[in-house]
Regions:
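Generic hydrophobic/aromatic pocket-lining and core-packing "Φ" positions
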Residues: 14, 37, 58, 78, ...
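Generic structural signal for hydrophobic
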Residues: 17, 40, 61, 81, ...
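Catalytic beta/alpha-barrel core
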Residues: 1-7, 24-32, 37, 45-53, ...
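C-terminal helical cap(s) of enzyme catalytic domains, especially alpha/beta-barrels
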Residues: 60-66, 147-170
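Short beta-strand/loop segments at the ligand-binding rim of alpha/beta enzyme cores
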Residues: 19-28, 45-46, 61-69, 109-117
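Catalytic cores of alpha/beta
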Residues: 33-43, 76-84, 121-137
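Glycine-rich phosphate-binding active-site loops on the catalytic face of alpha/beta enzymes
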Residues: 47-57, 90-99, 134-156
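Glycine-rich, proline-tolerant flexible connector loops at the mouths of alpha/beta enzymes
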Residues: 1-21, 142-152
Length: 170
């Protein structure tokens, strides 16, 4: 599970999940600089996901002790990430970065790359992404929308996850 670091409580949540569910693989998302990266690692993140990249951030990630999935939104980002050795990337925001047609075009010239699109991925378009040979996963909040979380409607979240699996033959 990815804990996005967007609130002051996020790091404590990451640590609490690690403490309460030690077998769960928990990572940190929305990593944007070296200090946030260090805090995420100190709180037990087992993988790192960034929303975007800069040369400075990629340099900080080079020494990261856990797997990293850097975020990209265009061909320049993609090529910069590959210069640092990355072949598995997050496309964010996918819907504003060209979506499935963009990833199809990228596959024609860089078939060795794999993507996890997020941002604008929904139950109505997830299959379009997952049908592409260079998409290994998708991410989206439709499976755990904020209303369900606030209401502690775990059944609705479970049902949405099961439906996503069934629709995509996972």
């Amino acid at each position: 599970v990815e804990v996005v670091l967007r609130t002051p409580a996020s790091l404590a949540l990451l640590q609490a999940i690690k403490d309460e569910l030690p077998d769960m693989v928990v990572g940190a998302g929305t990593i944007t600089n070296a200090s946030i990266l260090a805090e995420a690692i100190a709180h037990g993140a087992q993988f790192i996901i960034t929303p975007t990249i800069t040369p400075t951030l990629l340099t900080a990630l080079a020494d990261c002790p856990v797997p990293v999935v850097p975020g990209v939104s265009n061909m320049s980002d993609i090529l910069l990430a590959t210069e640092f050795g990355y072949t598995e990337l997050k496309l964010f925001p996918a819907s504003l970065s060209g979506g499935a047609p963009f990833l199809k075009a990228v596959n024609a010239v860089l078939p060795q790359l794999r993507f996890c699109p997020t941002g604008g991925v929904s139950s109505s378009n997830q299959a379009d992404y997952l049908a592409l040979p260079n998409v290994i996963a998708v991410g989206g909040t439709w499976v755990a929308n904020s209303d369900w979380v606030k209401a502690k409607n775990w059944r609705a979240i479970t049902d949405a996850c099961v439906l996503a699996q069934q629709e995509n033959h996972i």
